[in-house]
Structures are given as structure tokens and as C-alpha cells.
Swiss-Prot record:
Function: A GTPase-activating protein (GAP) that modifies Der/EngA GTPase function. May play a role in ribosome biogenesis.
Entry-linked NCBIfam families: PRK05244.1-1 (NF003560)
Coiled-coil portions: none
Transmembrane feature ranges: none
Protein name as annotated: Der GTPase-activating protein YihI
Listed GO biological process terms: ribosome biogenesis
GO molecular function: GTPase activator activity
Signal peptide feature range: none
Ranges of Acidic residues composition bias in the record: 159-168
Keywords per UniProt: GTPase activation, Ribosome biogenesis
Species the sequence originates in: Yersinia enterocolitica serotype O:8 / biotype 1B (strain NCTC 13174 / 8081)
Record-linked HAMAP family: GAP_YihI
Polar residues: compositionally biased ranges: 47-66
Length: 188
């Protein structure tokens, strides 16, 4: 028994009136022509020369739109070259920060404080041991010792070094006496 041919189903077949044409393969000449056109379009895809630095050229198309302000251009506010009296008045009206006055130490208190300074003692010990101090440490020692000398003069305190000077002054007198007396060996 022969069965009749089945008709194609609607979901498998293309809709009526639209036939799928066969794709015909392009020839080498057609491919070359298309490639040349793509290459020509690709050449012109970038910006013109100098487009990065010439902003005016790119704004020609946007002249109908509101032009954006160039951020590289500074303020047009004039800068005063001469100081006016109004500016001085503003400066004087600023509130001055109150500086708390440190309680002044009496010279005796300051002298005892400087004499008991641990940092100064350590630096003087290093100097006695023939060590070289840094510039900051040497400056600190010099300033502190100068202040101690000034305070001692203010208070009328004399150092024991002056006694050594008096002994040195007495020795030349003794030498003169010995020379005048005649034989220096007799006096010993």
C-alpha cells in the first residue's frame, strides 16, 4: 500500500511567500572591492591633525549650542595692586588670640631650675669625656650656660674661677719680691 506524501508542517516550513534564496558565494574581485572600501573608511575614522590643541575647530559644530567655558582660562576679576585703607581696617578688626602669660620665675628659681637640668648635666658629662656633641646639643649647652652666667651676675654670685685669677696675680708679685731680694733659693 502506497501512502501519500505528507505535506510539510507549518512550524517546519517557511511562511508562505518568503522563499529563502541561496546564498551565492562572492568572487575574489567583489571581496577585494569591499576590503578597499572598508580600508578607505578606516583611514578617515580618527580626528583631524591638531584637533587636540585646536579647541576652536571642534567648537564650530557646537556654535549653535551654548559654549562651555574653557577651564584653562582664569578669573577676570581685577587684582588690586595697591593696598587700600579699607583692607587695613579689616586686618585690625580681627580678634587677637589671648596669649596666656607664663608666670615669670624669680631669678633664684630659674637658676636652681637650670642647675638641676638633667639634659644639661648629661651633655656636660659627655663634654668632659671628650665626646663631640651635635649642633643642636651644643647650642642648647651654650644658651643654657649663658643664661646661668647672666642670672649669676644679676644675683651677684661669683664663680670660684675668680679665685684662681687672684692667685695668678699674686704669683708675679712674689716673683718680683724674690728677684729684688737677691737669691731666690734663700726664700725656700
Amino acid at each position: 500500500m502506497k501512502q501519500p506524501n505528507k505535506a510539510p508542517r507549518a512550524d517546519r516550513a517557511a511562511p508562505k511567500g518568503t522563499a529563502t534564496p541561496k546564498r551565492h558565494k562572492k568572487t575574489r574581485v567583489e571581496l577585494d572591492i569591499e576590503a578597499r572600501e572598508r580600508k578607505r573608511q578606516k583611514r578617515h575614522s580618527g580626528n583631524r591633525s591638531g584637533a587636540r590643541t585646536n579647541i576652536e575647530g571642534s567648537n564650530k559644530t557646537g556654535s549653535t549650542q551654548a559654549q562651555e567655558k574653557d577651564p584653562r582660562i582664569g578669573s577676570k576679576v581685577p587684582v588690586p595692586l595697591v593696598v587700600e585703607s579699607k583692607a587695613k581696617a579689616k586686618l585690625t578688626t580681627k580678634p587677637v588670640a589671648k596669649v596666656e602669660a607664663k608666670p615669670r620665675l624669680t631669678p633664684e628659681e630659674e637658676l636652681t631650675k637650670l642647675e638641676n637640668d638633667e639634659r644639661l648635666d648629661a651633655l656636660l658629662d659627655r663634654l668632659d669625656n671628650d665626646e663631640v656633641l651635635s649642633k643642636e646639643d651644643q647650642a642648647y649647652v651654650d644658651l643654657t650656660l649663658d643664661r646661668i652666667d647672666a642670672l649669676m651676675e644679676q644675683l651677684g654670685i661669683e664663680l670660684g674661677d675668680d679665685e684662681d685669677d687672684e692667685e695668678r696675680e699674686e704669683k708675679p708679685e712674689d716673683i718680683l719680691k724674690l728677684l729684688k731680694s737677691g737669691n731666690p733659693k734663700d726664700t725656700f
